[in-house]
Every structure is written in structure tokens, then in C-alpha cells.
Amino acid sequence: MQSIVPLHGFGGVPYSAVRKAAPKNLLDNSDFTNLVAQAGIGGNHGTTAYAADRWILDSGTVSYEAGVGLTLNGTIRQKLEFPPTGDTSTFVGMASGEASISYADGAVTITSSGGVLKWAALYAGVYTDATMPDYHPKGYGAELAECQRYYVWFDRYLSNGLLTSSATNYYMPISLPVAMRCQPTATSSGWIGRISTGYSKYTGSTKKAFNSLWISDFNGCRLSVCDSISTATDANNINVSFMVYDLEFCADIL
């Protein structure tokens, strides 16, 4: 393999200088022209309003056009799981219009009256116009994986579960796309249905709303969703297939 840069000691530069890493952008979902919004722009994660993943909508409204940016009339905020440890940090962003930016207590806050946000970055340490690194989007896939540490939404999920305790509870294992920050809370405005019997085991309906969700057996990338089923007529401890619609897991830092 041909070396592009001559090795140190042969008239070249030190290898360590070539390999010096660019500073890490500490913000998640920082490219406002290609946003991750699993619950939709301005949607709720649980009971909390979000402009998009990781960006809490503290006040006002937002709208979005892919490739253009996020129009903000209000305030959004991102709380960092691992804030910078030094005394000084540098925030940089790009917007069409005006926006005010602040950083305190491990959170970045952006306020604007109609400005269109393009991107944002937070770096540990002090940078000037001359030393500030160029902004490079991480890419949608990388941003989605980072965001799913804090929030995961399933439009639908098929799983083999267990109906037990006199057919009043079910346990449904779910594999998460990434390890979540902590044991999440599970919420849903959707429903669950039996696959193997065409949902016929649920009295008076082909589908059933969730009753009282809880989580068990959480190990980072896997958990079991549990709920009570008062209308099922199955025997104890049988394996069944469930289809779940509109199920979310929240583990963000508020």
C-alpha cells in the first residue's frame, strides 16, 4: 500500500500530527436540514413535546422542510448526557435569520422568532474563527443511532410472547436497535392483537388497547413489555404471537 504522507524521520511530518482527530461535536441530531424525528416534527415523546429527537420544545412552534432547515418560533433545548468537563466550551451554528444561543448546566438552548436553523455544534474548549473546525454532518444513520439511545418508536412490532397468570398478563420480548441510556418508560396510544387467531381471543373486538404497560428484564438492548389482558380467554402459560402498533420507549434527559 502506498503511503500518501512521508514517514517522520524521512523528511515528512510526525505521524501523530497526521492522525490528530478533529474535535467531537457533542450535540446529537445537529443537522437541521436532515433531522431525525421519530415521533414527527413537534411530536411528543411520552408527554414531553419535542421539536425533533433530542431537541425538547420548551415553548412555541416549529416547522420543517427537508434540505432547508427547521423554522423556530420559540425555544428548543438539548440536555447533554456527557457535558464538557472543561471550564470553556464553544458553540457554533448557522441560521437564516436571527437566533440566540446559550449553554448552561449541561444544556444547549436556542431561541428564535422565525429563524431557520441549518446546523449546530458544541465543542469542548476554546476556538476562534481561525481555528473553528468545519461542520460535517454525521449522516442520518449515525444520528438516528445516537438518538435511539434516548427514544425508540415502533410503528409496528411482531413478537412471540407468553400469555400467563390465568390469561390476565402477557410478556412480549422486544429487541431494541441500540442500547438505551437507562431502563425506559413504555407508552402507547396504539393497540395489540393476536396474530395466530386473527385477534378472536379479545372479546368484542379484533384488537385491544393497552391497559397498564410496564417493563421487565431490561438489559440495554433487550426488554420485555408487559401488560394486563382482562378480556383474553386463553389458558395459562401459552406461547402466542402479538402484533403491536404505535409503541414508544423514552429514556431521554429532561
Positions of predicted regions on the chain:
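Extracellular and organelle-lumenal recognition/adhesion modules and their flexible linkers in secreted
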Residues: I4-L254
